Amino acid sequence: MSTQKPLIALAAGGTGGHVFPAEALASVLLDRGYRLALITDKRGAAYGGTLGKLETFRISAGGIAGRGKLSALRSALELGLGLIQARSILGRIRPAAVIGFGGYASVPGMGAAALAGIPTAIHEQNAVLGRANRLLAGHVRRIATSFAEVSHVEPKLAPKLVHTGMPVRAAILASRDASYAGITAEGPIELLVLGGSQGARILSEVIPAALARLPEALRTRIRIAQQCRPEDLEGVRRAYDGTGIDATLDSFFADVPERLARAHLVIARAGASTVAELTTLGRPAILVPYPFAVDDHQTANAHAAEDCGGAWLMQQDSFTADSLAARLDSLFTHPEALVRTAVCARNVGRPDAAEALADLVVGLIPNESGA
């Protein structure tokens, strides 16, 4: 007679950066036969993919820090209500372990699990421990990290740290076997521009102007796929008119893994998922961190990628058409630098991140280590 595997609860919600690793972990745990439940906020009802198939419990959740007294009070009340709701849910479903993925949506579920003595872990996607995870770090058993080094971690919590890497989508892993094909002497130059979940206007303004400054012999070899905000598409299209550049523009690319696989160079923001996908595939990138990200975590992510030789960091305030044109001219005329950077990026990639994170979570459960 077969024995039913334990139930594991995932506490995740909010933006894609918190949800993508939860999705990847869920796929691995389901493949291993574990039962799963999702504890999330109101946005969790819209999830598709693997998370959309899980038994889902929606709870109240508020921001960690409000912008004013009234906002802070409202957030505290929502968190308190969410904690009560989460305790009730955990009492009913009785999970063997709970793992959170940062963001305020994870706080009530993780807090309730810690109070109930349920084994817990959190996963930090960025190179800076996020505010929600900082609040929870002292109360969980393990802190899984995407980057080898993470700031804003109290020294006394260092023994809890486990570098698992950042889980990426299955489609990215499927493209990992595509080796980096360097730029040939006369061949096309494949350039991919990703602006984050909603595009980035600075990229739409600077990149066409920078490419227009390149020598014609280089410019006419460029094939660019660029993500833009919907309202910027027409203006960017006009900017490329007459440049001789083959430009494919859209507000969303459904085939990002395939485009990443064939790119000679990527220009992008420095979100955790983007950096993880670039290093998993081993693709060189120019990273332009979003300067207003909480705790400036994108700059920390970009520094981590640059420090290992896997990317070039360009701060937004110095990301101009002239500076970018000079950088691109150098890279495209000396493509061996792109090859070296691709190798370095791949060397720090963690294609096993989802499996490593699953091992960590399973290891929290008595009698399940090594299962």
Swiss-Prot record:
GO terms for cellular component: plasma membrane. Its EC number is 2.4.1.227. It catalyses: di-trans,octa-cis-undecaprenyl diphospho-N-acetyl-alpha-D-muramoyl-L-alanyl-D-glutamyl-meso-2,6-diaminopimeloyl-D-alanyl-D-alanine + UDP-N-acetyl-alpha-D-glucosamine = di-trans,octa-cis-undecaprenyl diphospho-[N-acetyl-alpha-D-glucosaminyl-(1->4)]-N-acetyl-alpha-D-muramoyl-L-alanyl-D-glutamyl-meso-2,6-diaminopimeloyl-D-alanyl-D-alanine + UDP + H(+). Pathway: Cell wall biogenesis; peptidoglycan biosynthesis. The keyword Cell cycle applies. It is found in: Cell inner membrane. It is an enzyme of class 2 (transferase). Signal peptide: none annotated. Belongs to the glycosyltransferase 28 family. MurG subfamily. This is UDP-N-acetylglucosamine--N-acetylmuramyl-(pentapeptide) pyrophosphoryl-undecaprenol N-acetylglucosamine transferase. The gene is murG.
